[in-house]
A protein has these predicted regions:
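Phosphate-end processing signature that detects enzymes handling 5′-triphosphorylated RNA
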Residues: 1-216
Length: 216
């Protein structure tokens, strides 16, 4: 990441679900505002998370990762849940080379500054999550994205304990054309729940992939 890279922030509003390997994809036809589903988009994601030796970031409800693959490759800082969602700040990778073979994961100064109120170096490896993701855009009548549905096959390693795990999960995240008011969002995600449960999915047992990788 170059010194002049600019961060971009957004609020993620999403629901997560646990599913079995054989669970079929949901039928989204009853979702409010959704008239079509975009083509499957495969993504090969590799995320490496860090924290301090004293787990200062975890105590603050913050996750810091460097992820490659997908449209938002880069460094990400996810804040704690606040109301309906979590604020995520993203920096592009640019000339960052900290995932070259054998390289140490070095947290860039801009990312360190973003979490300075909660944590200070040194940062150490916390977990690595590799994700074979298939993404689908849920589109309205104008072709705008109401939400994104992702089907994730995750392989995780807890770097502290050397423990490995694997699972499948789904996420549905509101997009730019999604409902903006609380009532509309509630109705939308109620319909998402109904579609997921009808397909055989269930509410996620963990609040995040990182939490599940760490056994929480």
């Amino acid at each position: 990441m170059s010194a002049d890279s600019h961060a971009a922030s957004s609020v993620e509003i999403e629901s997560k679900y646990d599913v079995d390997d054989t669970t079929p994809l949901p039928d989204w036809s009853a979702l409010p505002g959704v008239v079509s589903v975009g083509a499957a988009e495969p993504r090969d994601l590799d995320a490496r998370y860090v924290d301090t030796p004293a787990a200062d970031l975890a105590r603050a409800g913050i996750a810091v990762r460097r992820r490659t693959g997908g449209p938002d490759a880069g460094w990400h800082v996810k804040g704690p849940l606040d109301g309906a969602g979590r604020t995520e700040t993203h920096w592009p990778l640019d000339d960052d080379t900290s995932t070259a073979p054998g390289a140490d994961l070095v947290v860039p100064p801009a990312v360190q500054d973003a979490v300075a109120a909660h944590a200070a170096p040194p940062f150490i490896p916390l977990a690595r999550l590799r994700n074979d993701r298939t993404a689908y855009a849920l589109l309205d009548a104008d072709g705008e994205q109401v939400a994104e549905f992702v089907d994730d096959h995750v392989r995780a390693r807890d770097e502290r304990r050397g423990a490995e795990s694997a699972w499948r999960e789904w996420e549905v995240e509101l997009g730019p054309a999604g409902p903006a008011d609380e009532q509309g969002r509630a109705a939308f995600f109620a319909a998402v729940d109904a579609a997921v449960f009808a397909a055989g999915g269930r509410p996620a047992a963990s609040g995040s992939k990182l939490a599940r990788a760490l056994g929480h």
